[in-house]
From Swiss-Prot:
It holds the Pfam family TPP_enzyme_N. This is 2-succinyl-5-enolpyruvyl-6-hydroxy-3-cyclohexene-1-carboxylate synthase. Keywords: Magnesium, Manganese, Menaquinone biosynthesis, Metal-binding, Thiamine pyrophosphate, Transferase. The lineage of its organism: Bacteria, Pseudomonadati, Bacteroidota, Flavobacteriia, Flavobacteriales. PANTHER family: 2-SUCCINYL-5-ENOLPYRUVYL-6-HYDROXY-3-CYCLOHEXENE-1-CARBOXYLATE SYNTHASE, PROTEIN PHYLLO, CHLOROPLASTIC. Belongs to the TPP enzyme family. MenD subfamily. The keyword Metal-binding applies. It comes from Flavobacterium psychrophilum (strain ATCC 49511 / DSM 21280 / CIP 103535 / JIP02/86). It catalyses: isochorismate + 2-oxoglutarate + H(+) = 5-enolpyruvoyl-6-hydroxy-2-succinyl-cyclohex-3-ene-1-carboxylate + CO2. Catalyzes the thiamine diphosphate-dependent decarboxylation of 2-oxoglutarate and the subsequent addition of the resulting succinic semialdehyde-thiamine pyrophosphate anion to isochorismate to yield 2-succinyl-5-enolpyruvyl-6-hydroxy-3-cyclohexene-1-carboxylate (SEPHCHC). One of its GO terms (biological process) is menaquinone biosynthetic process. Its cofactor is Mg(2+); Mn(2+); thiamine diphosphate. Binds 1 thiamine pyrophosphate per subunit. Pathway: Quinol/quinone metabolism; 1,4-dihydroxy-2-naphthoate biosynthesis; 1,4-dihydroxy-2-naphthoate from chorismate: step 2/7; Quinol/quinone metabolism; menaquinone biosynthesis.
Amino acid sequence: MIYPKIPLAQSIIEICNTKGLHHIVISPGSRNAPLTIGFTNNPVFTCYSIADERCAAFFALGIAQQLKKPVALVCTSGSALLNYYPAFAEAFYSQIPLVVISADRPQSKIDIGDGQTIRQENVFANHSLYNANLVENVSEENDAKIQEAIHLATTKKGPVHINVPFEEPLYETVDTISVNTKIIDFDTENKPLENLDVFVNRWNDAKKKLILIGGCDPNVIQQFIIDFLANDTSVVVMTEVTSNVHHANFITNIDAIITPFTDDDFTNFQPEILITMGGMIVSKRIKAFLRKYKPQQHWHIDELRAYDTFGSLTKHFEVLPSVFFKEFIPKINSLESNYLPYSLEIKKVRTQKTNTYLATIPFSDFKAFEIILPKLPLYSQLQISNSSAIRYAQLFSIHSSIEVFCNRGTSGIDGSTSTAIGAAIASGKETILITGDISFLYDSNALWNNYIPENFKIILLNNGGGGIFRILPGHKENETFNTYFETSHRLTAKYLAKMYNFGYEKAVDEKTLAEKLKITINTKKSIILEVFTPTKVNDLVLLNYFKNLT
């Protein structure tokens, strides 16, 4: 086998292998040549070459999102490293393990005017779980730092940074390894669940308990929890589309429920106890409601973090939901309440009004989502881009067999396509990305990728700009708005599809969308379905929807 001659590179490769870090996303460069040589010449590693570092990082994020294990990113020195930052921040807030391994020049070459050189040490400090700044020579201290970084990425679920100085020559190889790495076995800390008696008493006394579930991996909220929560009349469960949690008694279309509320409705719906699980919340309306009508108690259940999103957090249970509810459920009493029946009656009325309204609207983004979502393949994976796409998806129910993901850690539009491609590769599932035109164009280099599988398909809603700005309070139809907010355009994905060997279909109305969607779903290759919707109709259709709910 071929190894890099530089001992420090050998140590990194040996430790990655021993610790099970086997998926390596490499961006071409010279300074990282020792790592590239070592990883690509060892068959235990699955290596990917992605030239654009920003795309590479989101691609790795998608793989790690699905594998639930760290993925390594390897880049050269200089600004290449900075291009990882958007995905690095997303990994931090979405709790996805990434290990960035950046090649650097030796410390003596920093800030002396050498080319392709920046201050790389601690460059991700604000969003990194650990920063391992290595020195040139092999040492136990270096080995310990590398292993600590991988351990924390794995157990604390987030990104870490290993900065590695290499001096030239960089391309020399040897046939045998020269390092003897000391492997560290880390203790895994599991926090015990505290005595719940006080919380059980509070629960038993409360007639209005609201459960709000944000983004979760599939099966994190187990069926026994779902059954318990769904059948207590004092409990209302609201789930976001990314929660991957389903029950007929749960409320999925949160905004449709609460947008028409009067002050009296808000007061009646105000919970005494709020329990939150999962990641970031998409709905602005539920956040505004809970910040104004605060619960007496807010408990968050998560092994690692708890954000005080509503300014009312009183308790963080640092365990998995399954651990908490397994202990909690046997201790509580059922309580008759009108909270759930009241909410389900509202849900029934809102659903009827929604169906009536959808039957009357013209072709638009809203109508397109109504047509697309029920036709998605069962047991597939749905990746959704940010901005208006995820908000439209929130207005519909999605079949329980479909797994839903969205980069809601930082809610950026910048890497949705790259993430979805990585996720499609790692999951092996039929993967559909629903994206808006600005998000798609922003990340079009994602298609510059030799690993795109046939199970990956894109449904692109092209409304000629950033349509979400038309439904925000600052919308005014003028040149400033069109240019600097909406970023109006007349671009199409047709020739990008041709350049990157994607299939391409086009829809412009309900009839062609139904026809082309069927073709897209049944096609056995990667394909883009571009759906053109009217720029100046979409916002009115959506705004009138909420007016019609009253």
